[in-house]
Curated annotation (Swiss-Prot):
One GO process term, biological-process aspect: late endosome to vacuole transport via multivesicular body sorting pathway
Chain's gene name: LIP5
Organism: Arabidopsis thaliana (Mouse-ear cress)
Annotated GO CC locations: cytoplasm; endosome membrane; multivesicular body; nucleus
Protein name: Protein HOMOLOG OF MAMMALIAN LYST-INTERACTING PROTEIN 5
Role summary: Involved in the endosomal multivesicular bodies (MVB) pathway. MVBs contain intraluminal vesicles (ILVs) that are generated by invagination and scission from the limiting membrane of the endosome and are delivered to lysosomes enabling degradation of membrane proteins. Thought to be a cofactor of SKD1/VPS4, which catalyzes the disassembly of membrane-associated ESCRT-III.
Length: 421
């Protein structure tokens, strides 16, 4: 693919984060894909390519399959927020202890992605927005220091006039994801180059550059928030404070040994929170959070030259993307120009064709109780199904759109129809 303006470039950071989390945090992975799909559907038809359309159509089908194995609820935003705060806290603790490295920058960047996808649930609280900006800035600042051969400066900006705003690269307002990273873009290649170790020369990992002009004040402008490296303050919710998070041990940690344990959300937390059940207050597990060993990017070679697919996470037994120090996990996503596999077989392959319930006979008339009022969960599910139908129509997938519309109608009119299935 020679088009440098491929719209699908902006979706890859969210899809790559979803791949990393698929096994141990499928709910967060689902919302990463949902956010990517919603962004993708906003791409004007005139700007879409065959690659764009293929990714979006496959995303719709993948989300439908993922929903069957998940239990969605109105409180999912709290779970995603808690996970984002935990990832942020892990990077922040390592940075403030003076141990920041390229892995720390990648973890900060991943946290900024998780903070960003919270916007799909509604307005983001100011403290989360500040952490989002700080995480993105910190990723760039650490990367810049390593590139210049100096030790990253721990904690907040030394200069009060340092710009913490997120670099913008387009109408979406998100920072640039287009830098080349040979370790991450192999997800979406038709022909793959040998993977590169993430510990190679740092020039292989492109992060947003730190802005050179002063704008807003420092992130922590409250004196009470200028906490020392070893005793961070509690975050603005009941999620565990940084001092209960495991100390980072370097990029060689095995990712995802324990799933994230969600903690209830309260607006006014006590001063000191107990650690979550997966942590020990004295000997915390260093592996309870993922190590994000790649920086999302999109190089020219990452786009196929033929009509691609964005199928399941089990397209190939050897994943295209994995941590360099851990065994490959079957959670990668790939493009393929070969004929699609069967819809769903015992070896884990999933076809990108939609797997939907059989449609009722066209001769069957639809009857429903007009006095029935569906609950909020059913209305939310019906809205999602309707969105999928609109997305399918954008690719002339009429039959798929009809099935989603029928599902939406069923949720709104049938008391026995189940939400989240």
């Amino acid at each position: 693919m020679s088009n440098p303006n491929e719209p699908a470039r902006a979706l890859l950071p969210y899809l790559q984060r979803a791949d990393e989390l698929q096994k141990h945090e499928p709910l967060v992975a689902y919302y990463c894909r949902l956010y990517a799909m919603e962004r993708g559907l906003k791409i004007p038809q005139s700007e879409r390519t065959k690659t764009t359309n293929s990714i979006l159509m496959s995303l719709i089908n993948q989300l439908e399959k993922d929903k069957k194995s998940l239990t969605l609820s109105p409180d999912d935003n709290m779970h995603v927020e808690g996970f984002a705060l935990s990832v942020f806290a892990k990077a922040d603790k390592q940075d403030r202890a003076g141990r920041a490295d390229l892995g720390t920058a990648k973890t900060f960047y991943a946290a900024s992605i998780f903070f960003e996808i919270l916007s799909q649930f509604g307005p983001v609280p100011p403290d989360i927005e500040q952490k989002h900006k700080y995480a993105a800035w910190k990723a760039a600042d650490i990367r810049k220091a390593i590139k210049e051969g100096r030790k990253p400066t721990p904690g907040d900006p030394v200069d009060d006039d340092t710009d913490l705003s997120i670099p913008s690269s387009g109408p979406s307002g998100s920072y640039d994801h287009s830098a080349s990273d040979t370790n991450t873009t192999s997800h979406h290649r038709t022909e793959l180059d040998p993977p590169h170790d993430s510990n190679d020369d740092s020039s292989h990992h492109q992060f947003p550059e730190v802005p050179q002009h002063p704008l807003p004040p420092r992130f922590y402008d409250n004196p009470t928030n200028d906490y020392p490296a070893d005793v961070p303050p509690p975050p603005p919710s009941s999620y565990p404070s940084n001092d209960h998070l495991p100390p980072p041990t370097g990029p060689s940690d095995s990712p995802y040994p324990h799933p994230y344990s969600h903690q209830p959300y309260h607006q006014d937390p006590p001063k000191h929170m107990p650690p979550p059940q997966n942590y020990s207050s004295h000997e915390p597990s260093p592996n309870s959070l993922p190590n994000f060993q790649s920086y999302p990017s999109f190089s020219e070679s990452s786009l196929p030259s033929t009509s691609p697919h964005y199928p399941s996470h089990y397209q190939n037994p050897e994943p295209y993307y994995s941590s360099p120090h851990s065994a490959p996990a079957p959670s990668s996503t790939s493009f393929s120009s070969a004929p699609p596999p069967p819809p769903y077989s015992s070896n884990g392959r999933i076809n990108i064709a939609p797997v939907l319930d059989p449609a009722p006979s066209s001769a069957q008339k639809y009857h429903y109780d007009s006095s029935y009022q569906p609950g909020p969960e059913k209305v939310a599910e019906a809205l999602k199904a309707a969105r999928f139908a609109v997305g399918a129509l954008a690719f002339d997938e009429v039959s798929t759109a009809v099935e989603h519309l029928k599902k939406s109608l069923e949720l709104l009119t049938n008391p026995s129809a189940g939400a989240g299935h």
